[in-house]
């Protein structure tokens, strides 16, 4: 029974729960790795060893957080749980493929862990650039195992993307047009399209790297007519859409949370929100070389990538101001989920502003590969994606489990996390402006003060993570069941109660159009 339910599951709710648990566990591993990084950088001098082992930790931290925490939780967890409920579908379009998408991830994770256990580990950074990732600088199986790990995670995501696109287009009630589906459903569909179009390019790039390493091809070796810059183009053609893949489902969740706790029946500017997400998705594909301003591209090429990157700020601004407009005149309930959403809006906007700074190719020459970049993408990921995940988690926790979290603990947890992440990453802007480079385990002692403060912040964040584990335990131990959920008429996922039955919408749902 246990095996049939959890190993061979074809139920979107159970698979969503598996994704959530796996993502939470991977999040703990990723947090542990980040604590190792900040412990090493907490003061000058060496703690862990040389820069190779340090970069293995940094690389693993990135891969674990991106491919095994944010994506499984946002797309696999929230996506699986909420999309069928929100569109009134009985399940996903391909329930067994859904199960395979999940079970490809643990082996993928295993390969990534194995890569650090053999030889010297893969100390390449998450970008895996040759020639550093070639078989000379990284002899042995480490990088090969990392490449196989990425292949599996990529296949998992591509299958999941096909599943979500098919489900969302094909399994709505006949009366519902695409423009009547909730914004979270839109965000997942756009994310799935981005995955479907970008991951094959990554697969091509890392497969060529694999053959360069093992079969003496020279795709990225100038000695045989190849070019390492080609790898960078292939990687970032995936890598830039990837960062939008990480944030778009968060946009969808924040739209729902802000609308719900403002007491509104719909978000401000629904069509504008949809248009903005589609614009971000499209523009995300034509700005990749802003990661490569230092490789010596023509000035006109740099001018194009600078201006195209800045254009993304417009639809992003549409979203930020629409969230603020949604709250305007509302009866705002200061619930923990709303606090996460407000923290998201504030901190994501700061991260966006530093992104605008970095989009200037002239400035990026100086700031590239400094801690300014680290601060920028951790503001949008560690305080964008993660805050959205936390907000979504405390908002939909009653739906997933039938129990309620303790409001006071949840607010304390938010406060500790808010202080921790800001204390960790705000000083890194100063380090970057002062020229401290990334991916080094040691630094001149002029950088000590801000690094020490940053490391203190990371330990505050760690206490927040531990408190969250306690908070979830407390909810399951206390068993406070949900009495009633307000506003269900505009929040379809709640209509079956908390938690919903194993099978929902078994009969086709006919929903009367408001027009």
UniProtKB/Swiss-Prot annotation:
Q: How does it sit in the membrane?
A: Multi-pass membrane protein
Which family would the database say this protein is a member of? Belongs to the heme-copper respiratory oxidase family.
GO annotation, cellular component aspect: mitochondrial inner membrane; respiratory chain complex IV
Please tell me where heme a3 binds in this chain. Answer: 376
Q: Membrane side Mitochondrial matrix: which residues?
A: 1-11, 87-94, 171-182, 262-269, 328-335, 401-406, 479-515
What residues does Mg(2+) bind to?
368-369
Assigned keywords, A-Z = Calcium, Copper, Electron transport, Heme, Iron, Magnesium, Membrane, Metal-binding, Mitochondrion, Mitochondrion inner membrane, Respiratory chain, Sodium, Translocase, Transmembrane, Transmembrane helix, Transport
In terms of superkingdom, the source organism counts as: Eukaryota
Q: How does it assemble?
A: Component of the cytochrome c oxidase (complex IV, CIV), a multisubunit enzyme composed of 14 subunits. The complex is composed of a catalytic core of 3 subunits MT-CO1, MT-CO2 and MT-CO3, encoded in the mitochondrial DNA, and 11 supernumerary subunits COX4I, COX5A, COX5B, COX6A, COX6B, COX6C, COX7A, COX7B, COX7C, COX8 and NDUFA4, which are encoded in the nuclear genome.
Which residues are on the Mitochondrial intermembrane side of the membrane?
41-50, 118-140, 213-227, 287-298, 358-370, 434-446
The cofactor required is: heme; Cu cation
Query: What is the species of this protein?
Result: Heterogeomys underwoodi (Underwood's pocket gopher)
Q: Which residues bind O2?
A: 244
Ranked from the top, the taxonomy reads: Eukaryota, Metazoa, Chordata, Craniata, Vertebrata
Q: How is the cofactor bound?
A: Binds 2 heme A groups non-covalently per subunit. Binds a copper B center.
Single GO biological process annotation from the record: electron transport coupled proton transport
* Enzyme Commission code: 7.1.1.9
Transferase as UniProt keyword: no
As its record notes, the protein acts as a catalyst of: 4 Fe(II)-[cytochrome c] + O2 + 8 H(+)(in) = 4 Fe(III)-[cytochrome c] + 2 H2O + 4 H(+)(out)
What this protein is called in its record is Cytochrome c oxidase subunit 1
Its job: Component of the cytochrome c oxidase, the last enzyme in the mitochondrial electron transport chain which drives oxidative phosphorylation. The respiratory chain contains 3 multisubunit complexes succinate dehydrogenase (complex II, CII), ubiquinol-cytochrome c oxidoreductase (cytochrome b-c1 complex, complex III, CIII) and cytochrome c oxidase (complex IV, CIV), that cooperate to transfer electrons derived from NADH and succinate to molecular oxygen, creating an electrochemical gradient over the inner membrane that drives transmembrane transport and the ATP synthase.
The pathway this protein participates in, as annotated, is: Energy metabolism; oxidative phosphorylation
Q: Name one Pfam family in it.
A: COX1
Provide the transmembrane region boundaries: 12-40, 51-86, 95-117, 141-170, 183-212, 228-261, 270-286, 299-327, 336-357, 371-400, 407-433, 447-478
A GO term, aspect molecular function: cytochrome-c oxidase activity
Q: Which residues bind Cu cation?
A: 240, 290-291
Where does this polypeptide localize?
Mitochondrion inner membrane
Could you tell me at which residue positions the 1'-histidyl-3'-tyrosine (His-Tyr) crosslink is annotated in this chain?
240-244
């Amino acid at each position: 029974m246990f095996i049939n339910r959890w190993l061979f599951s074809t139920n979107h709710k159970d698979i969503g729960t598996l994704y959530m648990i796996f993502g939470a566990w991977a999040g703990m591993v990723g947090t542990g790795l980040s604590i190792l990084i900040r412990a090493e950088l907490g003061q000058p001098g060496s703690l862990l060893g040389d820069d190779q082992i340090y970069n293995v930790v940094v690389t693993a931290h990135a891969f674990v957080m991106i491919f095994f925490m944010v994506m499984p939780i946002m797309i696999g967890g929230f996506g699986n749980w909420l999309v069928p409920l929100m569109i009134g579908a009985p399940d996903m379009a391909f329930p067994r493929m859904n199960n395979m998408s999940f079970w490809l991830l643990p082996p993928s994770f295993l390969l990534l862990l194995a890569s650090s256990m053999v030889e010297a580990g893969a100390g390449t950074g998450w970008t895996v650039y040759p020639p550093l990732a070639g078989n000379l600088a990284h002899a042995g199986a480490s990088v090969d195992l990392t490449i196989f790990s990425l292949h599996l995670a990529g296949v998992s995501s591509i299958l999941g993307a096909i599943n979500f696109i098919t489900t969302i287009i094909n399994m709505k009630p006949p009366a519902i047009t695409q423009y009547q589906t909730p914004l979270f459903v839109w965000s997942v569909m756009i994310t799935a399209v981005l995955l479907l179009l970008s991951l094959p390019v990554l697969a091509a790039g890392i497969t060529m790297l694999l053959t360069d390493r093992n079969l003496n091809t020279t795709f990225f070796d100038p000695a045989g007519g190849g070019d390492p810059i080609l790898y960078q183009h292939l990687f970032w053609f995936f890598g830039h859409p990837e960062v939008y893949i990480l944030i778009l489902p968060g946009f969808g969740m924040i739209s729902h949370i802000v609308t719900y706790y403002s007491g509104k029946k719909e978000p401000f500017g629904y069509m504008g929100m949809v248009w903005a997400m589609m614009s971000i998705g499209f523009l995300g594909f034509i700005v990749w070389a802003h990661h490569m301003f230092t490789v010596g591209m023509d000035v006109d090429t740099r001018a194009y990538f600078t201006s195209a990157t800045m254009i993304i700020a417009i639809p992003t601004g549409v979203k930020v101001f629409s969230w603020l407009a949604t709250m305007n005149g509302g009866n705002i309930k200061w619930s923990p989920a709303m606090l996460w959403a407000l923290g998201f809006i504030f901190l994501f906007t700061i991260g966006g502003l530093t992104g605008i700074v970095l989009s200037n190719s002239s400035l990026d020459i100086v700031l590239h590969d400094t801690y300014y970049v680290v601060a920028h993408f951790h503001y949008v990921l560690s305080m964008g994606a993660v805050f959205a995940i936390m907000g979504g988690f405390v908002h939909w926790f009653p739906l997933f489990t039938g129990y309620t979290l303790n409001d006071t603990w949840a607010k304390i947890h938010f406060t500790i996390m808010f202080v921790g992440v800001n204390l960790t990453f705000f000083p890194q802007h100063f380090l970057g402006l002062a020229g401290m480079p990334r991916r080094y385990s040691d630094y001149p002692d002029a950088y000590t003060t801000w690094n020490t403060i940053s490391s203190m912040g990371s330990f505050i964040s760690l206490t927040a993570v531990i408190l969250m584990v306690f908070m979830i335990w407390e909810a399951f131990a206390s068993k406070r069941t949900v009495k009633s959920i307000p506003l269900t008429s505009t929040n379809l996922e709640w209509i079956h109660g908390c938690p919903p039955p194993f099978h929902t919408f078994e009969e086709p749902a006919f929903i009367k159009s408001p027009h």
